[in-house]
Amino acid sequence: EKFDVIIAEGFLNTLNKRDYYFKKIISFLKPGGLLIINYDDVYGGFFEFLKSYILFKSCYKNNIKPDSEKGLRIAEKLFKREFNKLNKSRTFYSWWKDQLINPYAAKTWSLQDLIKLANTESMSCYSTSPIFNKSSLLKWYKNIDPKDLNPKKINQVFIEEWKKNLLNFLIGHDIGTPINLSDKELSQLKYFINKMNLSFKNKNLDKKIKINKTVNKIFYYNRMKSYRKEFLDIIKLLNSSTNNINKIIKYYTKSKKLKKTWG
């Protein structure tokens, strides 16, 4: 049986053979059908993953299990005050359980990954949430070339617009600064994020995490120097020999920018 609309919400990216199942679901669509999915985005989750890393690293330094009652208390001291300011639909406990310490949160995708898969199935990206592709608003309909309707051409436009808006996804709101990273730089950024996310598997917590040039560049050249300073400071603190949780908590909660970032 074929369907006009298929909704696959919040699970595809967690599957071991996710590319296979993505294509399998598409095979159940009627011509012109819509597939609606959501997923954990590797770039959009940057600061959410940083929160997890801060928690895991703080707990590791003090031989505390992140999923224990003590781990929850540390998370509350770090994040609860700002969490309570959000327009939210779940409790802090649920967020801690579902996101901060959940290993499935590290099973990420990106729009790039999905576009590559869509191209192999002649599928085009129709829309996103949030909406960031405004390129079509600037073109007179009589000037549209049939080639513009080619799925790969449509998808490439989405990718180009997505790259320009990358900082907005990182920070969680529109900062009005377009950026265009190369594929190599995007890969380096993803590499850093995935290194942080090894903490979900209790790996690499005994090692210092190195900030690569791309991560530095993103913060330095895009009117984000205050974000950069606080980010570098917290990483330096986590990389240090201190096991003083209160010192880490104090720096994070007193930060101006860092504590207000969400995935």
Mark where each language-model region is.
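Conserved class I S-adenosyl-L-methionine
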Residues: 34-81
